């Protein structure tokens, strides 16, 4: 993987307002310049965007539809692929790496592009240059010889596989619709990989794209897609992390079926898609799956998705459309390739070579993706998921794993990825503001099969990006649908990105176990803010069971992230969902799923189906500020997972902001912090409304999804029982209803399958009736509230209401509440906070949990500090994007870093100050007997004094060095000041004095070191006697024992 190439034909300059931004799409693996002529469609710009922060963004305005350009590109790509192939397998797809540039968000202004125009970038999947290309054209789907070139991942990709995927011609299309103001489009990069069809237009972006990516930050402003290119592996992760945006993909409800129906359709669809406006895409393109990757980060929002894996995809086909809540149109379609596409979905579009067979392989290959790519971002994970379901194997793939309908499956996959992205939305409605953005969803879900991916590559994104965890989707699990969910648990995420403790990791795989990483430790507070971390890219397999396990920590993490919310996030709880992710899966929501509820409401209860994110916006998108909405929609498509994911992501951002709110629900301190949360809550509600759009798409998906998700749900529910009991109750039944529900509630629906469902059962109709109903806070709210009150944690009722928003909300809310509650407890520590049984020392009691490591300031924060903090957080202006599309993010001044400030032991005071004599006991010194010493292991070695000799040798070297310096100084002195002329010149005199002083120092040092060395070696004077004693005493005993054994 070479350094990024300079912009070439692949580079696209966004037209229109975004003129400043350019995308560069590079083949991830190859550096060679593309052979094909520059595509006409793309305008070339000599400069790269990468440098500027804006690179990440792609101008929504620019649209590159040229097929001819694409073709040329394809041909070039093919050359490339042939040029080197790491693997002979055709299936390999080459991941496209999109490198998000963190600064991008800020730098570029977002210009709204004509809403209609889609931007598609076709380029070989080379790593994108820093600039983010909106779309990749995976080229045509021809299967070129796949060279597997490693793409350069942005983030480390844990597995080497990253490079694996050869580049396959695939296109990623990113659709952004600037027009959507409020949603702030996040450019979505859609990768439409057609695996098989070379000619498909990859640009699914329809003109309207609708912003498939929603800009997460400002509701209105588009997000940068900057990070949107998908990088393979680390890059993807990074992208994810950086971008704030979240894309929401919303599958069309009907499409999904259609999609499943015929893989072939995809092709057709593709082309049509091109021409068709984005809006249509969502419906029209059933076959195509849209994977939107949204990077959650503003920056790299979307990578999205890969082509559908063909077969699976096809089934899945449901295209995801990213719907912005604001603009409903957005959709990203991933055409399902022929079903066979492997759909590696590796982020990069995978070549999908066109053969369907690959699909099966893809699973294996997927690994590649997964391994190699952390791509958290949309990373094709979504697609992957589909594919991943290996069992599905080929087209049927829909097959078992996926959702009942293939579409679902695909969705799932995409879903995580997209929604993950979506989730990411930057919205940080909450005061959190900046930090929030990190929430960017990290959900890149990489469903990649590859378990190996076990850890998604973590992507470190900026703080914003959380890493999604990609769950491995295990095809075996039925939950596969949900599987894809991303959890945003920061916790889970493998430690890969520990750094962001906060990020949520999306867990994509439902089945796999989730690896918990306690990322969140720090997260709780900042998590959201920091949000970035986390991202663990690693995929975690969630096991439903595991999930449960996770959930506590997850919750915590999430919470951390969300502070509490996340934790409740149910995802933890959510975990209940069968897909481990389920919780997330719950709803497509995925992460949220269980959380979903939370999400909305959850906020408090992170559990919320929707986003676990604190925002709790109904739609994840909303949640995240702008992007969130998208997520929800996506989730629908994914049915369960996606939606959730989106939400989650958003959530997380919100969480950051909201964290407190969420937290409030969960832990006491958080509760105290409630005020901060309050601020967030309102946002949540708003967000919620956004969610509405989601509902529609959801429906479709949910139906398909429904089955599996539902199934998954119950298990999940059970798993998290403690937290989710209520949820479960609601959920289970609902789970069946879930289908209806899913359809209904946009975001939740899927997740609803689980979560939503829970709430939904009755509501399902409601939901179906309309998101708005769902949204209608009243009903859900009530439910939530009830839940909340019992939970106590739910405290932030308002947050819950948002959940309510989601239709799921009610149930979800409950779930969330339940979850959240436990979760809330969890956040502070891995486990829920308990009141100490005994009165601890006064001091420790004052300090708060004695052992809480994180307790630092946080711990203390009582209502008062919380309020203060909340105010402080709120004080900076909220992020906003000005008319020119430039996004302003308030930066919270951080206290200077000192060694002491960040290390404070909350329990130390209690240890060193005693209230009663009995607290102190003199330690009795035990004198070692000679025999005991002699029997110690390695005692004879120590007696030899090897350490002393080693040290003595080093001291000798020091004296030799000093001697050498002394000699040089002597020569210098003689050379500069011959004879006694020194006195004549002041300067010479001064130099002479300095030399003389240094010589004296050298002598002194040599003498002292030699003396020290000699006295040190005297310790060994008694060596012989000591060894004699040791041998006499030590061995006798040992020998006697051995002899006894021998005798026996």
UniProtKB/Swiss-Prot annotation:
The lineage of its organism: Eukaryota, Metazoa, Chordata, Craniata, Vertebrata. The keyword Phosphoprotein applies. Acts as a transcriptional repressor. May function in the assembly and/or enzymatic activity of the mSin3A corepressor complex or in mediating interactions between the complex and other regulatory complexes. PANTHER family: HISTONE DEACETYLASE COMPLEX SUBUNIT SAP130. Component of a mSin3A corepressor complex that contains SIN3A, SAP130, SUDS3/SAP45, ARID4B/SAP180, HDAC1 and HDAC2. Interacts (released by dead or dying cells) with CLEC4E. Belongs to the SAP130 family. The modification Phosphothreonine is found at residues 355, 856. Residues 67-80 have a biased composition (Basic and acidic residues). The N-terminus may interact with a transcriptional coactivator. The C-terminus may interact with HDAC-dependent and HDAC-independent corepressors. This is Histone deacetylase complex subunit SAP130. Residues 40-54, 590-613, 649-667 have a biased composition (Polar residues). Residues 1-95, 458-477, 576-617, 649-687, 819-871 are annotated as: Disordered. The modification Phosphoserine is found at residues 442, 465, 855, 875. It is found in: Nucleus. GO terms for biological process: negative regulation of cell migration; negative regulation of stem cell population maintenance; negative regulation of transcription by RNA polymerase II; negative regulation of transforming growth factor beta receptor signaling pathway; positive regulation of stem cell population maintenance. It holds the Pfam family SAP130_C.
């Amino acid at each position: 993987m070479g350094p990024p190439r300079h912009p070439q034909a692949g580079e696209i300059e966004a037209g229109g307002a975004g003129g400043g931004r350019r995308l560069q799409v590079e083949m991830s693996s190859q550096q060679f310049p593309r052979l094909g002529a520059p595509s006409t469609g793309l305008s070339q710009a000599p400069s790269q965007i990468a440098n500027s922060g804006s690179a990440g963004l792609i101008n929504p305005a620019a649209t590159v539809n040229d097929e001819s350009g694409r073709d040329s590109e394809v041909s070039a790509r093919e050359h490339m692929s042939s040029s080197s192939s790491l693997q002979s397998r055709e299936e390999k797809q080459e991941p496209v790496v999109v490198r998000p540039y963190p600064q991008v968000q800020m730098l570029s202004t977002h210009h709204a592009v004509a809403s209609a125009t889609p931007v598609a970038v076709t380029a070989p999947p080379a790593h994108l240059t820093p600039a983010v290309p909106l779309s990749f054209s995976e080229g045509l789907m021809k299967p070129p010889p796949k060279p597997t070139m490693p793409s350069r991942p942005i983030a480390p990709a844990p597995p080497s596989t990253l490079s694996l995927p050869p580049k396959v011609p695939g296109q990623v299309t990113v659709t952004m619709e600037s027009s959507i103001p409020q949603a702030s489009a996040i450019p979505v990069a859609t990768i439409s990989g057609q695996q098989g069809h070379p000619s498909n237009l990859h640009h699914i972006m329809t003109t309207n794209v609708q912003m498939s990516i929603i800009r997460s930050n400002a509701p209105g402003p588009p997000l940068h897609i900057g990070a949107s290119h998908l990088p393979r592996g680390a890059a993807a992760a990074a992208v994810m992390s950086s971008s704030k945006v979240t894309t929401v993909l919303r599958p069309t409800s009907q499409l999904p079926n259609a999609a499943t129906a015929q893989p072939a359709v995809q092709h057709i669809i593709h082309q049509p898609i091109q021409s068709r406006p984005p809006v249509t895409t969502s419906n029209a393109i059933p076959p195509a799956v849209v994977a939107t990757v949204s990077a959650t980060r503003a920056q790299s929002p979307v990578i999205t998705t890969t082509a559908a894996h063909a077969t699976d995809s096809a089934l899945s086909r449901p295209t995801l459309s990213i719907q912005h809540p604001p603009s409903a149109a957005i959709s990203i379609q991933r055409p399902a390739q022929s079903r066979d596409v492997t759909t590696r979905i590796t982020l990069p579009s995978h070549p999908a070579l066109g053969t369907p067979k690959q699909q099966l392989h893809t699973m294996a290959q997927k690994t590649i993706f997964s391994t190699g790519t952390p791509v958290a971002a949309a990373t094709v994970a979504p697609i992957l998921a589909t594919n991943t379901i290996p069992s599905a194997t080929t087209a049927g793939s829909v097959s078992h794993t996926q959702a009942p309908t293939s579409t679902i499956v695909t969705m799932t996959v995409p879903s995580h990825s997209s929604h993950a992205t979506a989730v990411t939305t930057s919205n940080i409605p909450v005061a959190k503001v900046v930090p929030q953005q990190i929430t960017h969803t990290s959900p890149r879900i990489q469903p990649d099969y590859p378990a190996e991916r076990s850890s998604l590559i973590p992507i470190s994104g900026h703080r914003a990006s959380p890493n999604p965890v990609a769950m491995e989707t295990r095809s075996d699990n039925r939950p596969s649908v949900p599987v894809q969910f991303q959890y945003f648990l920061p916790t889970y995420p493998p430690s890969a990105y520990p750094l962001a403790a906060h990020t949520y990791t999306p867990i994509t795989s439902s089945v796999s176990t989730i690896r918990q990483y306690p990322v969140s430790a720090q997260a709780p507070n900042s998590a959201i803010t920091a949000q970035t971390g986390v991202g663990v890219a690693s995929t975690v397999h969630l096991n439903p069971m595991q999930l449960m396990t996770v959930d506590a920590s997850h919750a915590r993490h999430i919470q951390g992230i969300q502070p509490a919310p996340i934790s409740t996030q149910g995802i933890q709880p959510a975990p209940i969902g069968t897909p481990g992710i389920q919780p997330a899966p719950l709803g497509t929501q995925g992460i949220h799923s269980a959380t979903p509820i939370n999400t909305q409401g959850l906020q408090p209860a992170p559990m919320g189906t929707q986003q676990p994110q604190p925002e709790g916006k109904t739609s994840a998108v909303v949640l995240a500020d702008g992007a969130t909405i998208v997520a929800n929609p996506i989730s629908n498509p994914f049915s369960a997972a996606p939606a959730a994911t989106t939400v989650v992501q958003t959530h997380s951002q919100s969480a950051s902001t909201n964290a407190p709110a969420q937290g409030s629900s969960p832990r006491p301190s958080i509760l105290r912090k409630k005020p901060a949360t309050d601020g967030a809550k309102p946002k949540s509600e708003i967000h919620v409304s956004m969610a509405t759009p989601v509902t529609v798409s959801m429906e479709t998906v949910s139906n398909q999804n429904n089955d599996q998700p539902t199934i998954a749900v119950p298990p999940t529910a059970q798993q998290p029982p403690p937290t989710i009991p209520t949820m479960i109750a609601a959920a289970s039944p609902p789970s069946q209803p879930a289908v209806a529900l899913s359809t209904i509630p946009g975001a939740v629906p899927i997740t609803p399958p689980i979560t939503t469902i829970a709430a939904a059962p009755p509501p399902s109709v409601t939901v179906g009736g309309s998101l708005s109903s769902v949204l209608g806070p009243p009903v859900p709210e009530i439910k939530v509230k009830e839940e909340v009150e019992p939970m106590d944690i739910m405290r932030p009722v308002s947050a819950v209401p948002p959940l309510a928003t989601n239709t799921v909300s009610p149930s979800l809310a409950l779930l969330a509440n339940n979850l959240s509650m436990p979760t809330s407890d969890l956040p502070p520590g891995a486990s829920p906070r308990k009141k100490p049984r005994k009165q601890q020392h006064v001091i420790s009691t004052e300090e708060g949990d004695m052992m809480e490591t994180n307790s630092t300031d946080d711990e203390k924060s009582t209502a008062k500090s919380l309020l203060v903090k909340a105010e402080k957080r709120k004080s900076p202006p909220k992020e906003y994007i000005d008319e020119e599309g430039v996004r302003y993010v308030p930066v919270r001044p951080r206290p200077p870093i000192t060694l002491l400030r960040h290390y404070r032991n909350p329990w130390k005071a209690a240890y060193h100050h005693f209230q009663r004599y009995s607290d102190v006991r003199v330690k009795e010194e035990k004198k070692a007997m000679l025999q005991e010493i002699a029997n110690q292991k390695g005692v004879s070695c120590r007696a030899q004094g090897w350490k002393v000799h080693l040290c003595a040798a080093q001291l000798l070297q020091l004296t030799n060095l000093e001697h050498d310096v002394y000699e040089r100084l002597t020569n210098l002195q003689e050379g500069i000041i011959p004879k006694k002329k020194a006195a004549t010149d002041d300067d010479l005199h001064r130099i002479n004095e300095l030399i003389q002083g240094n010589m004296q120092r050298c002598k002194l040092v040599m003498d002292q070191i030699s003396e020290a060395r000699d006295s040190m070696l005297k310790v060994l004077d008694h060596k012989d006697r000591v060894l004699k004693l040791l041998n006499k005493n030590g061995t006798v005993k040992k020998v006697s024992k051995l002899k006894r054994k021998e005798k026996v």
